[in-house]
Amino acid sequence: PVSLATLTTGAMPSTHGVIGARWRDYVENDAVELIAGRKGPGPYNLIAPTLAEALLQHEPGAKAVSVATEAMSAVIMAGHGGEAFWLDSARCGWETSPYYAPEVPEWVARSNRERYNLSYITPEWRTLYEKGRYLNTRNWDIVLTGKSRKDKDEPGEGRLKLTSDYDKMLYTPAGNTAVLGFAKQAIAQFKLGDDATPDLLCVCLDASHRISEAYGPESVEVEDMYYRLDRDLADFLTFVFAQVRDGNATVVLT
């Protein structure tokens, strides 16, 4: 969260106050959770304004929406203003917290009732392309196209035990696809970019770093994730420039 806070505030940790996901208070020796508070997940320990906050303060009528797989990422991008949404770890739907809104909008609630996110999850993670396309060779859980699970190159049953739908979203490319899919809905439902007033959409693809941490940067899983992400981003950006007024959108990718 430290680097994300630096990106969204333009400040160093000594200024924005984020030094980790949790730490010890050096006065009381109490454990401090970055986004934990009485109103649910919120930017209680983020002390510098985010870009979203600055936009809302200086541009009346502007809208700012933040979307991520994890609550911490969505909160750090949104800061103290705007809309923030993340995946519910229990049912794998989309949620917010009372800090931002009493409840999610009806279009989000409807998607949750229909369990739409489950459509992104597949029984097993298979490579997008044939084996010869991949430069990396180490694979743990992914199944190469044209092979079955029992023919997997690596022995054993894989490194991760993805038992919950939330884990399957967080540690497979499905998480990125779901986030970008929800971001497209947010653009349409909140009418982002629909007029001359600038709006802001912040998206964090948490599954990317989760997969990299779990399997290693030289794994087939990471390579396949980026192939899929490239395709997902192409689809998302095509939607953005078609949806936004006069195609007038600025994209920052980091």
Give the location of each predicted region.
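Structural motif
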Residues: 200-204, 252
